Amino acid sequence: MTKNRTEVADIDRSLYDFTYGEEGFERLDAGITPDIVREISAKKDEPQWMLDLRLKSLEIFNRFPNPTWGPSIEGLDMDNIVTYVKPNTDQKHDWESVPDDIKNTFERLGIPEAERSYLAGVGAQYDSELVYHNMQDTASKMGIVYSGIEEALHNPQWEPLIHEKFMTLIPPTDHKFAALHGAVWSGGS
């Protein structure tokens, strides 16, 4: 049996190809430097070990060559990439409290309907931050813990586990862009 492959060029991006203005957003300077990495870590009030991991990951990123697999990235100018953009809102646990412009983005992508229909919980990331987090009662009653990574990092119960496990499945030494992730990650669950 032959399997059909969907080529990246064949994907209709029109659903996802839209932008909003950046009013009300906090944005760091472009580039991937030790100062930017330190600023991300400071904004998140991370423990020293996380800053150390970020800086070590940046060293690995700068040392590794660009990959030769996949599409050409010759035109990729890392000095023009902004790695941290924070919407002007705190994390919400009630969908109705999420600002309308952010809510409209997720509505357009179908996220709220997917949550209501299929998921036990969802965390919605908008640019660099988790802006919405909700766990259905049935999952939490079963003892399932679902948290944003930054929230867990500040919880004395979970921080040691994150310290032990963070980036062990795909370590920064795996490849250049795993190292980039280790240096400038933000948000997630």
Q: What is the role of each PLM region?
A:
Residues 2-189:
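Glycine-rich and polybasic anion-binding loops at the starts of cofactor/ligand-binding domains
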